[in-house]
Amino acid sequence: MAAEGWIWRWGWGRRCLGRPGLLGPGPGPTTPLFLLLLLGSVTADITDGNSEHLKREHSLIKPYQGVGSSSMPLWDFQGSTMLTSQYVRLTPDERSKEGSIWNHQPCFLKDWEMHVHFKVHGTGKKNLHGDGIALWYTRDRLVPGPVFGSKDNFHGLAIFLDTYPNDETTERVFPYISVMVNNGSLSYDHSKDGRWTELAGCTADFRNRDHDTFLAVRYSRGRLTVMTDLEDKNEWKNCIDITGVRLPTGYYFGASAGTGDLSDNHDIISMKLFQLMVEHTPDEESIDWTKIEPSVNFLKSPKDNVDDPTGNFRSGPLTGWRVFLLLLCALLGIVVCAVVGAVVFQKRQERNKRFY
């Protein structure tokens, strides 16, 4: 894992232990804690290395139990999934494989943070590999389907780690991470790489890395944040940050992967869930969180992502038709100013002629 140290970015921290020659007590799990003071005066929601908030009933951690069998405590396998002593392989580097792993226990935490240690690798060259991994927090589990090995029209949250661009017209650079929230009414469109239903996303070069790769998902008080550590720097990098997300409690965590004509090894090394200690208002506490319908309060439609290669419609750069409209407005403004200037100039000329 990456070197030990505190990395503060967007209120996040991760302590990774165990490399020789570094300070620290040795290997240990990454876990969250809220610090009220940082350097004497900074207040923030920050995770640290204290394991008291790790929820083991929702976590997949080495050493795995049940190696060599078709099941393990707290987790169910499906499809091509294979358990080894070092990783859970969702699919091998073979065509037409689907596999998934799902937690037994529904999660009733209102605020949580999931750290995923994963690896996607294979022999395929550029754009000759696929398809990717999906991380799930959904109502239904162990239902195979066409969306990275799991069902379409799901209820809940999905984070897609997509390695292959099916849409040949896309401007985006793959691998690409995107987020989708669904109440069962939306279908994931593989031909467009899910762009029509994507809330936000980012390019993330996680395939065939020679070091560990991590992804973190935080959900707290309606804010969904996804961050990555892919550069072996022990540093979280912001990928997705969305507010107005509503997710119920009582759903299941899982991971799935699928291959088609192209393939890769899709491995999960660990999934660690942490409880975030967050105060809620009396009104929030009185809500039956199991009855909440998955939804997002949009500033704009996710379809606005179509011409935005970053996928982040809230803060992405101006591209495509947005640039065209901006230039058109500027041109019209110049024309109007020129016409008004010409009229004013002509009237001044006529007024000057009256004095001669």
Curated annotation (Swiss-Prot):
Topology feature Lumenal, residues: 45-322
Task: Provide the GO MF annotations for this entry.
Answer: carbohydrate binding; D-mannose binding; heat shock protein binding; metal ion binding
Question: What is the protein's name according to its record?
Answer: Vesicular integral-membrane protein VIP36
Q: What does this protein do?
A: Plays a role as an intracellular lectin in the early secretory pathway. Interacts with N-acetyl-D-galactosamine and high-mannose type glycans and may also bind to O-linked glycans. Involved in the transport and sorting of glycoproteins carrying high mannose-type glycans.
One record GO biological process: positive regulation of phagocytosis
Give the Cytoplasmic membrane side ranges. 346-356
Question: Cofactor stoichiometry and binding?
Answer: Binds 2 calcium ions per subunit.
Which keywords describe this protein according to UniProt?
Answer: Calcium, Disulfide bond, Endoplasmic reticulum, Glycoprotein, Golgi apparatus, Lectin, Membrane, Metal-binding, Protein transport, Signal, Transmembrane, Transmembrane helix, Transport
Q: Which domain of life is it from?
A: Eukaryota
An annotated GO cellular component of this protein is: extracellular space
Disulphide bonds annotated for this chain are C202-C239
How does this protein sit in the membrane? Single-pass type I membrane protein; Single-pass membrane protein
| Cofactor needs | Ca(2+)
What residue range is the signal peptide?
Answer: 1-44
Record-listed Ca(2+) binding positions: D162, Y164, N166, D193
